[in-house]
Amino acid sequence: MLHRIPAFLRPRPFSGLPLSCGNRDVSVAVLPAAQSGAVRTENNIQRHFCTSRSICSKKVDQSVPANEISQKAAESQGRGKETLKKDLLDIIKDMKVDLSTANVKTPKPRGRKPSASLEATVDRLQKAPEDPPKKRNEFLSPELVAAASAVADSLPFDKQTTKSELLRQLQQHEEELRAQKDREKRRISFTHIISNMKIAKSPSGRASTRPQHQIQFDEDMDSSLKQEKPTDFRKRKYLFKGKRLSIFADKAFADEPPEPEASPSLWEIEFAKQLASVADQPFENGFEEMIQWTKEGKLWEFPVNNEAGLDDDGSEFHEHIFLDKYLEDFPKQGPIRLFMELVTCGLSKNPYLSVKQKVEHIEWFRNYFNEKRDILKENNIAFT
């Protein structure tokens, strides 16, 4: 409660010192400012009407003119309009609304009228072309429609208009999403079609430019040609099934003897041995050493054979032993006959020489005695 100011009380001059709440001098100190036409500021109101008994230490601001206060009020009102417009646009842009808000209705404030900016926004939204309800709600789920109606009921505007605008915004996003999906499907289907495309070929095929009288070989043997050929080129043409031209004689090719296989020369054998010696490595175990000794002839080959290493010339056993038939040209008696019998006896007991080598050995002695015939006559030795 403010105390009344008596008429006879002389007001004191205004001082810059703060005054406590409930003091009688407060009203008296304010009178000079009121008489001069100044308006109370927010600081003065806060200083005079306080609930605490402590002394306010804030400095008293100077009185503000009325035109500056009106400018501040206009700016605050403009900011309020912008914030309200921004809040409305944020509500419209939000698409995801919980279903729990569908049955909740916020009480509308009584006696509150929408501002001019909100009315202008609503009018602008009403003038926007609206889609038919069936087409608009075609792709929207009933949950989104119920959520949009709940949001429209919670706003202090026309319910149908707000609901239609929310559904239109949701429908726009849904159409953009479906258009993007359609583009992806179209791209996938196009690449799938291109990958499965095949070049169509005419069934007739290209005519062959090769003359008919020319011999045609089988061209399907080429492994690099893996593509399927038309039906006209699949027929194989063999060289020996056609009509004979009778150009070459058959006997000329049939009488040719087969070429004998040339045996490797001494130099080739020696070169192979050198290569083998270069590639030889030290033995890893005793078995490899025994194998090498067997190849060199130092060990018997298994299974053990008495004739191992001997060249079999196809001769029989008696041809190695009975060699008397090769002594017909030698004398029937005398020292030469005795010597040749000893030679044949030694050759028959030699298992390392072949029959051919034994015969050559006897022939060498025959030729030797024929060359020394003159010497034998001088010594009275008969060779015949």
Swiss-Prot record:
It comes from the Eukaryota. Residues 121-136 have a biased composition (Basic and acidic residues). It is found in: Mitochondrion. The keyword Zinc does not apply. One of its GO terms (molecular function) is structural constituent of ribosome. Residues 1-54 form a transit peptide. One of its GO terms (cellular component) is mitochondrial inner membrane. Signal peptide: none annotated. Residues 101-136 are annotated as: Disordered. GO terms for biological process: mitochondrial translation. Keywords: Mitochondrion, Ribonucleoprotein, Ribosomal protein, Transit peptide. Belongs to the mitochondrion-specific ribosomal protein mS31 family. Component of the mitochondrial ribosome small subunit (28S) which comprises a 12S rRNA and about 30 distinct proteins. This is Small ribosomal subunit protein mS31. It comes from Mus musculus (Mouse).
